[in-house]
């Protein structure tokens, strides 16, 4: 209590506090020689994105995966798709250096939402279409009727863009509220496919009632990608040790504790992918 007002710690532990209480259930025992900087990414960020394709919504070998947002969370999902053996991994992000970086981690195609405009959903559907319109001839739909449209799209879509709370110093999002991106992620998911919403939007999202009811798509909640910390984090440590997960190159800048304010500013400016504050 502070002057009679209840005070709650951020995320239940108070990660931005000078003093915090680490409850036992928040502690995960790890036995590794990996650098602390890499292990910090397993508290959220990289681990949450990777879990998007391996915990709740599980990517499948040969599947079509789309990731909206190439920040640390989205790049975790890209790596999950690569490790799974996805057929193609399409990354959507307005920032060029992030699109280019995603190609190094497993993306096969990148799209600029500002350049694609309202045609981005159809562009993704075409990329996921297959060689023809006949399923028994290697295509992805039963014919040219309405089913042919809703059957085209990605098997798995991860929305990890989030809102743009401050004007960045790089290319801006087409919709700072992220509502449009959430709807695009839903629309480019094929009938029977899976969508995970990991980014935040503070506005109502008007999902079409017919597609919710009839197309058999599944929406997965994006709370840390379904990460089970006691089960998954030790597994991800092993994957980092084996070189399956890249937890090195995604750290694009390190800061001292005195540079914490600059770290937050750089994150808001989106001039870095992942920043790590190191204690001396």
Residue ranges with predicted function:
Residues 1-27:
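Glycine-rich phosphate/adenylate-binding loop and adjacent beta-alpha elements
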Residues 25-26, 31-122:
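Mid-domain Rossmann-like dinucleotide-binding core that forms the NAD(H)/NADP(H) cofactor-binding site
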Residues 56-61, 82-84, 100, 104-218:
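Glycine-rich cofactor phosphate-binding loops and adjacent beta1-alpha1 units
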Residues 66, 90, 194-196, 220, ...:
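Structural detector of well-ordered beta-strand residues that form the stable sheet scaffold
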Residues 94-95, 201, 225:
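Residues in the short beta-alpha loop(s) of Rossmann-like NAD(P)-binding domains
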Residues 191-196, 207-249:
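Rossmann-fold dehydrogenase core element
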């Amino acid at each position: 209590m502070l002057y009679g007002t209840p005070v709650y710690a951020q995320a239940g532990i108070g990660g931005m506090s000078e003093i915090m209480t680490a409850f036992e259930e928040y502690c995960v025992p790890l036995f590794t020689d990996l650098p602390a900087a890499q292990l910090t990414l397993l508290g959220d960020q990289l681990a949450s994105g990777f879990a998007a394709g391996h915990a709740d919504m599980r990517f499948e070998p040969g599947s079509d995966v789309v990731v909206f947002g190439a920040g640390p969370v989205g790049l975790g999902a890209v790596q999950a798709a690569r490790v799974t053996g996805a057929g193609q991994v399409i990354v959507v992000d307005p920032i060029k250096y992030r699109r280019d970086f995603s190609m190094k981690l497993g993306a096969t195609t990148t799209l600029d939402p500002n350049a694609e405009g309202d045609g981005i959903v159809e562009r993704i559907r075409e990329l996921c279409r297959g060689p023809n319109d006949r399923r028994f001839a290697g295509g992805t739909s039963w014919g040219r009727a309405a089913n042919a449209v809703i059957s085209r799209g990605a098997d798995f879509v991860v929305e990890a863009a989030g809102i743009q709370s401050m004007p960045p110093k790089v290319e801006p999002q087409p919709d700072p509220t992220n509502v449009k991106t959430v709807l695009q992620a839903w629309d480019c998911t094929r009938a029977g496919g899976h969508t995970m919403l990991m980014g935040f939007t503070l506005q109502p999202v008007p999902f079409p009632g017919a597609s919710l009811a009839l197309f058999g798509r599944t929406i997965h909640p994006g709370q840390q990608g379904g990460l089970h910390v006691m089960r998954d984090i030790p597994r991800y440590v092993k994957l980092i040790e084996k070189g399956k997960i890249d937890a090195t190159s995604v750290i694009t800048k390190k800061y001292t504790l005195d540079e914490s304010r600059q770290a937050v500013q750089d994150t808001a400016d989106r001039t870095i992918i992942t920043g790590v504050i190191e204690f001396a």
